[in-house]
Every structure is written in structure tokens, then in C-alpha cells.
Amino acid sequence: MAALAACHAGTGPARPTSSASRFVFLWAGDADKAASDFLAVVDADPRSAGYASVVATVPAGAIGTRPHHTEYAMPADGLLWANGFDASRTFVFDLRHPERPALARTFGDPLPYGHPHSYARLPNGHVLATFQWEMAGGHHETGGLVEFDPDGRMVRAARAAVPAIDPGVRPYSLAVLPALDRVVTTASDMHLESRSAAVQIWRLSDLTLLQTILLAPGRRGDEQQLTAEPRVLADGRTVLVNTFTCGLYRVDGLDGPTARARWVYSSTWNGRWEGKSFCAVPEVVGRFWIQPSGTEHALVSLDVSDPDQPREVGRLVLGDTDAPHWVAGEPGGDRLIVTGYGGLESRALMARIDRATGALRLDEAFTTPGAARPGVDFGRDTWPHGATGPAIPHGAVFSRR
């Protein structure tokens, strides 16, 4: 599977502003699972003669991990956390010198928790992660939140299980609101064994689970299923949460004893329970929410200056087999890196947004020379680390400069 009045959002502390990013980092799996998964560094400088070329790679030293989520934006310390979901491992890449990337460390599960999914930085430099499962003998149950120090050592953890409310909760993604001492998490099961409508509210200071909200259906009747990505609005108090079934919900009241969630928007979903049909990892640029829509083979730009009344202001229609899934923005810029499924499985696209109007367009210059379709081609035979064949990118972020 798999985030606003000038409402610039993020998953935690404010993102930096900068001039154009020179690189994009993409976490990719070897397509035939015969060679190591790896992180690729791509030239993202539009002035460069090597624009869209792969300038370096660093193997993870592990095969078939299913590279999935990275952090949603490049952290200030230059160390990017990423998960190999099927292997239940975290990989930390040192990208302080982008043309010489290195694997800083890797580690497994902080038992009893397993299968890390999403990561968010905390003001103290630690990393808070969602873990889908708690291992219980020969089976698995609802996981929880785990806080790590910068070296990957577990500091504390908390269970997300609420069997009386929703036994299908599987901690998925998260948004941190330090000023309110709150964390908001979603609950989608990566294996689709359950279809949770839960959003959970936590106290950040001690990781106490305060509240589990079950989203109500929207106008279509099924928008509440599979809660996906929360993003914090610029007021630091309001959160928008999307669902894989293409609903959008507003969560507020986080500064009080009881938070509230309400449906505000729906986009098209074809009803198929598969990654290439879902609405997935969004990005927010200024007052615009950029939603990948697998069903519509498009990126959709919503003006959310009034979070109760999102309205479509831009749309980028891709190829008829392209299913965009992951969107990440350039810090302070107007570019978006996009990965996905279907026709995008072994490609990465660059889009641009007009920060004044929300209009979207494809950057066709960001294309591998000789490729038949726009984007960086990951279906190649040879990489800087060797002739390991095609790869499938998923998590992707821009460098901070």
C-alpha cells in the first residue's frame, strides 16, 4: 500500500525551506528478488546535464525485504530511515554526502513488536515508528508505537490494541503534534485481513493511548475503510486523514479532552481491494493537498484552505495503466516525486505544482534518455552497484539542498 489559509502540513516539525533540491532518494526492491534491495540517488538538478540519471546506489545487504516506506521528508541529520516490510527490518541510510551514500545501520524487531511501517521525527531527535503487529506465540495481534534513539535503540513502546472497539487495528502511519503533546495514528492492515476505520489519538509525552475514533462513512458509504495518512495543518491543531478508499476526514479538538473526526471529501474509488486502485500517500504544498488516485490514474490537487470544504483545483492525468501511490514534495519548492503501481511499478515521475493556483503538470525532462515513457526508468539491467536487473521503487524523498 501502502498527508492547510496557507496551511502547510507535515508529519511532524515544520519542513525546511530551500532552493531547488539537487537529488532524489528512492528506496527500491530488486524485482525478481535475486539481488539485494537498494537505495538509489537520482540527479534532480534541472540545470544538470545528468538530470534524471542515477548517480549512485547503495545495496541494503538484504534480498526480498519488500522496500516500502521511508520517512516522508529528508531529515535534518541526513540519516534516512526506511523499512523492509516483509523482512520486518529497518534500514538507516547515511545521505549526508548524496553522491557517496552508505548504509549506516540496520536492525530487526524490538520484540514483541514486529513489521515497522512509518517513521516520524520527534523534537528530541528520536524517531517514533508504527509497528503493525505484536508477536504472540505463533500468531500476531495489534501492534503499537515504538520510540527509538538515533542509534536505533528502543526507548519506550505502547500497545495500540483496543479489542472491544476494533480488533483489526494495525498501526499504519502517524502525525506528531509536539505543541499539543499529541500523536495521531491510522490503522490499515498491510495484508488486508481487516479494513479498519480507526484513527487513534495518543499523548506524546508518555505514549498513552487516549482515544480510538471510528470514522463514519461519507456520502458514498464506504470512505471510512482503511485509514491511511494523517497530516498536520499549519495551525498545529488540525489534522486531515485520508483513507485508501478515497475519503478525506478532518480531525480537530486535539488540544482538548476529546478529539472529533468528520468526513469532508471523497474522490473516486473503483471498489477494488488492491494497491493500484487506492488513494494513498499524499503531499501538502501550501494550501493544496496533492492526492494520488490509483483508480483515476491521476494526481488530484485540492484547495484545503477551508479544511471543511476541499475543492479540486488541479489534475494531472497519467497513463491509463499508471497507478500513482506515493507523492513527496520538494522542500520549499514546486516539485513532486511520484512512485506507484501498474505502469508506474518500475518508474518514478516528476510533477510540478503552481503554488499560486494548485495546477499540476508533468516534468517530461525528468526522463531516462531513450525511455519510451516519462520518468526515471527502474526497469534497467545495470546499476552503479552491478548488473542486478529491474527494480521497484516505493518510498522517495528530495534532498534538503
Give names to the regions the model predicted.
Residues 15-20, 67-77, 116-123, 172-181, ...:
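Structural signature of eukaryotic scaffold interfaces centered on beta-propeller domains
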Residues 32-35, 85-88, 136-142, 191-197, ...:
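Short, solvent-exposed loop/turn segments at conserved positions within beta-propeller repeat blades
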Residues 41-50, 92-101, 150-154, 201-210, ...:
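Short loop/turn segments immediately following beta-strands, especially the blade-tip
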Residues 51-121:
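Blade-loop segments of beta-propeller domains
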Residues 53-67, 105-112, 155-171, 209-225, ...:
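Surface-exposed loop and turn segments in beta-propeller and other repeat-based domains
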Residues 95-178, 189:
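Asp-box/WD-like beta-propeller blade repeats and closely related beta-sheet repeat scaffolds
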Residues 169, 174-300:
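Beta-propeller domains
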Residues 272-353:
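Loop/turn-rich, solvent-exposed surfaces of beta-rich toroidal or solenoidal domains
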